[in-house]
Amino acid sequence: MNPPKSAPDAQGLSYRDAGVDIDAGDALIDKIKPFAKKTLRDGVLGGIGGFGALFEVPKKYKEPVLVSGTDGVGTKLKLAFHLNKHDTVGQDLVAMSVNDILVQGAEPLFFLDYFACGKLDVDTAATVVKGIAHGCELSGCALIGGETAEMPGMYPDGEYDLAGFAVGAVEKSKIIDGSTIAEGDVVLGLASSGIHSNGFSLVRKIIERANPDLSADFHGRSLADTLMAPTRIYVKPLLALMQKLPVKGMAHITGGGLVENIPRVLREGLTAELDQNAWPLPPLFKWLQEHGGVADAEMHRVFNCGIGMAVIVSAADADAAIADLTAAGEQVWKIGTVRASREGEAQTVVA
């Protein structure tokens, strides 16, 4: 084959000249293989590197239904870039998807990630993937594959974006869809670990206005670490609870807060009435509200306000559920009850 014609002084171009470093990509794969290996579980067929990842549905399921979820970390990443702190956003990525599929009763089976950047920094990417693997370990699911996309010119130097994909399974007869929720049922609130991964556009605006010292102590750790605390993963304690008593409904408190997520599991004609005095508003949310001048209603629409997962059970099972979850290391409060809706009323009200 004849070489292409070019200007007399032109040098031959390589992919590296175009901004893509194949060697860096290979180095990243070598770094992250041990992290992924720690997440392996029954059902994984083959290792990392195939064109597709293979997973055998566990034989314990008689009529398995697959449940899938996908999400990102949002503009929390902008704060991660500013702080040069990349060790927690991987857990955030996993949590956002596995907590979502958990709500329908699913056991997370496997997870895939997508990491996109303009120029690949191997150490940064490896730190992120290590966090993803840690999140998978906390969830009991396998990090079965992923994609690293180095795309020159698409992202500013030092920045990247993340997407995650979780697949789980639930017995068809045990799908949790909220259909059995009735008047008199109790809404339990499980404590969040902080802001989780929603509302960070407002958080960043408040930081811009208040201009705090992010390295300063804030109730025992730096404000930066408090803001970046990884999203709590509720998978193992709630899967265990489902084996012991009927869980009627669950809501992962993400974008939209309590007032927009709990209605997603309620039948028409039912309202969850929450008592805002039933649980303490954590100091970080008080700080955000004070420095941002954020109204109560807006706080409840944007932030989790200290509740990362809502669980609905019968009144007869509430105390047993609280005891079981507390023994598993969760902080739990009775935060409300389910009643008939009044005309023109929202399906979740905070009083």
UniProtKB/Swiss-Prot annotation:
Q: What is its EC number?
A: 6.3.3.1
- Protein's cellular compartments: Cytoplasm
Catalytic activity reported:
2-formamido-N(1)-(5-O-phospho-beta-D-ribosyl)acetamidine + ATP = 5-amino-1-(5-phospho-beta-D-ribosyl)imidazole + ADP + phosphate + H(+)
Q: What's a single GO BP term from this record? A: adenine biosynthetic process
In what pathway does it function?
Purine metabolism; IMP biosynthesis via de novo pathway; 5-amino-1-(5-phospho-D-ribosyl)imidazole from N(2)-formyl-N(1)-(5-phospho-D-ribosyl)glycinamide: step 2/2
Q: Which GO terms describe its cellular component?
A: cytosol
The record's listing under Gene3D superfamilies reads: PurM-like C-terminal domain (3.90.650.10), PurM-like, N-terminal domain (3.30.1330.10)
Cross-referenced InterPro entries: PurM-like_C_dom (IPR010918), PurM-like_C_sf (IPR036676), PurM-like_N (IPR016188), PurM-like_N_sf (IPR036921), PurM_cligase (IPR004733)
Q: Which UniProt keywords apply?
A: ATP-binding, Cytoplasm, Ligase, Nucleotide-binding, Purine biosynthesis
Which molecular function GO terms apply here? ATP binding; phosphoribosylamine-glycine ligase activity; phosphoribosylformylglycinamidine cyclo-ligase activity
* One of the Pfam families matching this protein, by short name: AIRS
Give the EC class as a word.
ligase
Spell out the PANTHER family in the cross-references.
Answer: TRIFUNCTIONAL PURINE BIOSYNTHETIC PROTEIN ADENOSINE-3, TRIFUNCTIONAL PURINE BIOSYNTHETIC PROTEIN ADENOSINE-3-RELATED
The family classification in the record reads: Belongs to the AIR synthase family.
Protein name in UniProt: Phosphoribosylformylglycinamidine cyclo-ligase
Naturally occurring in which organism (per UniProt):
Burkholderia ambifaria (strain MC40-6)
